[in-house]
């Protein structure tokens, strides 16, 4: 759903054009394509991500496997956009529309390269109602309830402390 292919009037969406990308494929690909275009001009990637994924997940629950694949699928769609743009510019150099998404796609792919994939997965898992890190509640409960051996033979809280400064 490239936003340049949506026909709107003052009230709302009236139709879609250019079904060249329409194929039968896993539904997660539709979300990845929608996110790749929505995030291109987003001022707040995580807010946009949250709004779209939350709405999508309310209608189609994402599985853990789909969540783990999402960042790679978004980047793949951006790479495809860039390849097609370069190819079409060579074939039709006078048609600026064929490379209309190129600048924004480069910007977004560079932004996404800075995002830690595990952080991205944790954010999406949280948006979808999962624990951000699988089994994190079990680990947190274990840490809270486990009696660890003392590292020192004294209590750090009950020890006189002196701050030593090493600068001039």
Indicate residue ranges for each PLM-predicted region.
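Generic secondary-structure boundary/loop-capping signal
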Residues: 3, 21, 59, 94-95
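Active-site activation/catalytic loop segments of kinase-like enzymes and analogous catalytic loops
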Residues: 28-61, 77-92
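Conserved ATP-binding subdomain of kinase catalytic cores across diverse folds
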Residues: 61, 65, 168
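Active-site acidic catalytic loop and adjacent metal/ATP-binding pocket
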Residues: 1-29, 154-156, 163-164, 168
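ATP/Mg2+ or Mg2+-diphosphate-binding catalytic cores
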Residues: 81-167
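All-alpha amphipathic helical-bundle segments outside canonical DNA-binding/catalytic cores
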Residues: 64-74
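Amphipathic, non-membrane alpha-helical segments in soluble helical-bundle scaffolds
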Residues: 21-24, 42, 46, 72
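Alpha-helical structural motif
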Residues: 27-30, 66, 78, 101-108
């Amino acid at each position: 759903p490239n936003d340049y292919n949506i026909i709107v009037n003052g009230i709302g969406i009236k139709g879609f054009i250019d079904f060249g990308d329409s194929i039968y494929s896993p539904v997660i690909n539709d979300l990845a394509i929608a996110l790749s275009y929505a995030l291109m001009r987003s001022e707040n990637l995580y807010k946009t991500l949250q709004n779209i994924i939350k709405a999508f997940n309310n209608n189609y629950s994402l599985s853990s496997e789909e969540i783990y694949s999402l960042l790679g699928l978004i980047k793949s769609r951006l790479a495809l956009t860039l390849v097609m743009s370069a190819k079409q510019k060579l074939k039709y150099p006078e048609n600026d529309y064929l490379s209309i998404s190129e600048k924004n796609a480069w910007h977004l792919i560079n932004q996404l390269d800075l995002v830690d994939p595990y952080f991205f997965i944790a954010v999406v898992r949280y948006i979808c109602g999962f624990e951000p890190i699988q089994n994190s509640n079990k680990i947190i409960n274990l840490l809270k309830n486990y009696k660890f051996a003392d590292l020192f033979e004294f209590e750090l809280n009950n020890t006189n402390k002196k701050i030593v400064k090493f600068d001039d």
